[in-house]
């Protein structure tokens, strides 16, 4: 019998931004990693911990942060480019019915999901996970899969952490799906909230009275609120200071997507009022049709929006919204969100060690990322640093810089083909370039699903809009006799003719049209797009 393998030990050095508190920065230090966890955080000049005496740290030449945690992103849609929003809307049900939305978002995604011959799902999950990792995101929302008849659902297991999968008991699973029957019954909905550690709920997305009614629907006729400490309200754009006070009284939280709010509504959540009320706030980039390309981009949007509207958020506040705050909202803060002994080694290293450490991350571009680790495993980085860290994987380029990315995982979803990023990119480009041909097959499959005559085995995408997943998490509680949830039929497979579209670029650096498209978005207040472009 061969001896059991010992723990994997390695280390990396650089400037360390722990995010434990503002100013808690080690100008030069080393993080020692044993298997999936941080064994020690040691300033320069102090001895290595026991067991690491002969370990040579990887000199990153960069600043080390906790990996970014995103609490709002519909990853399945992140192959689509920015939608040119034709007008400002009052609530999400309005833009869902726009003709250009159906041909730019609903139609293409239905074609990809329902006309899939088995080659597109593996390509899509590979591509959208890469979009996260190359921008330093180590946790995001999960990708929902369904069997072909739509009766069984699960979350895809890949290289990223998924909030809805977690790793119990250390990282409890978040809830982010409400079956209609639960949402229509106030008591059942409230019970669901009480039993959850974190409930990610789309809440009052929009700026009009109808959007606000979704919040009022959380109150029953007796005056009790279905608001619990587990509730993390995504968007909350229709809420005012009084509403945020109600949320704070019940210890709820807020997830903010400033760029998406402005693109669709021309206004954003009153996060200053939310903060004044004492609410914890996290960031989410939403999705590529109306949002930042990644969470690193959303940090920039948050800074620009805060300055534009004089919201008063510091650079530390903004970085906290993508690290310590979301970890606390998920109840993961004992294991993630800050850099400390015993926590999981989910880390992000950005080139350079000078200047304000929080502004340094906000200003960084995708091509400035040196290394990303998840659970102590080097997942993405420069070719040189990945080699020194013992990582391996597929070669790619970000701008003109050589990078390596590793998707492999022992518990990766066994039912999904493992394809390279290059192959995934090729498949998706071809599919999006032939949407008209795919549309016929997708309409036929949609009809077969509706009639219950589907005989295919395996898994397909369960698109958020059509199957009531993440995007539909607003409550559908009765309010003055009216259902407050959206009509899923309104976003069913479209028969509007589809035309070829281009695959959304993996990064801003690799997308020559992203910033110009953003500048042409009519709902953005003057200066927002230009302010974001300055960072690139």
Report the location of each language-model feature.
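Active-site loop ensemble at the mouth of alpha/beta enzyme cores that anchors a bound cofactor
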Residues: 276, 284, 291-306, 368
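Charged catalytic cores and adjacent phosphate/nucleic-acid-binding surfaces used
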Residues: 252, 278-279, 309-312, 316, ...
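Active-site core of metal-dependent hydrolases
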Residues: 142-289, 307, 312
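Active-site metal-binding motif and surrounding structural segment of the metallo-beta-lactamase
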Residues: 46-65, 70
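Alpha-helix N-cap/helix-start motif
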Residues: 264-267, 292-295, 338
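Histidine-centered catalytic micro-motifs
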Residues: 67-78, 198-205
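Conserved, mostly hydrophobic/aromatic
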Residues: 61, 132, 247, 254, ...
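Active-site microenvironment of metallo-dependent hydrolases
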Residues: 1-51, 73-173, 187-192, 320-536
């Amino acid at each position: 019998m061969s001896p059991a393998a010992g723990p994997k030990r390695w280390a990396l050095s650089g400037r360390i931004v722990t995010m434990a508190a503002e100013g808690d920065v080690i100008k030069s230090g080393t993080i020692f990693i044993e298997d999936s966890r941080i064994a020690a955080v040691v300033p320069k000049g102090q001895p290595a911990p026991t067991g690491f005496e002969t370990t040579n740290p990887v000199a990153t030449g960069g600043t080390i942060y906790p990996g970014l945690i995103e609490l709002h992103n519909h990853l399945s849609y992140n192959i689509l480019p920015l939608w040119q929003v034709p007008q400002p809307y009052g609530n999400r049900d309005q833009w869902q019915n726009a003709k250009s939305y159906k041909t730019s978002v609903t139609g293409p995604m239905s074609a990809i999901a329902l006309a899939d011959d088995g080659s597109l799902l593996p390509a899509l999950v590979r591509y959208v996970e890469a979009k996260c990792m190359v921008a330093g995101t180590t946790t995001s929302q999960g990708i929902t899969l369904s069997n072909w008849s739509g009766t069984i659902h699960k979350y895809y297991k890949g290289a990223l952490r998924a909030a809805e999968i977690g790793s119990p008991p250390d990282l409890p699973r978040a809830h982010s799906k409400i079956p209609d029957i639960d949402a229509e019954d106030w008591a059942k909905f409230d019970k669901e909230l009480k039993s959850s550690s974190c409930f990610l709920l789309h809440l009052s997305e929009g700026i009009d009275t109808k959007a606000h009614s979704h919040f009022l629907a959380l109150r029953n006729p007796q005056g009790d609120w279905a608001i619990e400490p587990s509730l993390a309200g995504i968007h909350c754009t229709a809420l005012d200071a009084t509403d945020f006070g109600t949320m704070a009284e019940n210890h709820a939280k807020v997830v903010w997507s400033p760029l998406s709010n402005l693109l669709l509504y021309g206004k954003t959540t009153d996060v200053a009022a939310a903060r004044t009320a004492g609410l914890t706030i996290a960031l989410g980039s939403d999705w590529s049709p109306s949002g930042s390309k990644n969470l690193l981009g959303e940090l920039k949007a948050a800074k620009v929006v805060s300055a534009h509207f004089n919201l008063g958020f510091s650079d530390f506040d903004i970085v906290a919204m993508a690290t310590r705050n979301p970890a606390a909202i998920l109840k993961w803060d004992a294991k993630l969100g800050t850099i400390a002994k015993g926590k999981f080694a989910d880390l992000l290293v950005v080139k350079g060690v000078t200047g304000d450490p929080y502004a340094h991350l906000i200003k960084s571009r995708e091509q400035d990322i040196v290394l990303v680790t998840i659970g102590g495993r080097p997942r993405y980085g420069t070719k040189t640093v990945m080699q020194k860290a013992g990582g391996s994987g597929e070669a790619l380029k970000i701008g003109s810089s050589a990078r390596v990315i590793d998707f492999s995982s022992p518990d990766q979803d066994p039912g999904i083909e493992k394809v390279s990023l290059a192959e995934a990119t090729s498949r998706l480009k071809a599919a999006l370039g032939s949407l008209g041909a795919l549309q016929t097959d997708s309409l036929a499959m949609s009809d077969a699903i509706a009639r219950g005559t589907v005989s295919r085995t395996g898994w397909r995408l369960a698109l958020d809009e059509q199957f009531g997943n993440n995007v539909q998490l607003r409550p559908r509680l009765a309010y003055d006799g009216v259902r407050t949830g959206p009509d899923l039929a309104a976003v069913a497979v479209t028969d509007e003719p589809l035309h070829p579209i281009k695959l959304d670029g993996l990064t801003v650096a690799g997308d020559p049209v992203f910033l110009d498209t953003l500048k042409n978005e009519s709902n953005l207040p003057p200066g927002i797009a230009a302010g974001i472009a300055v960072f690139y």
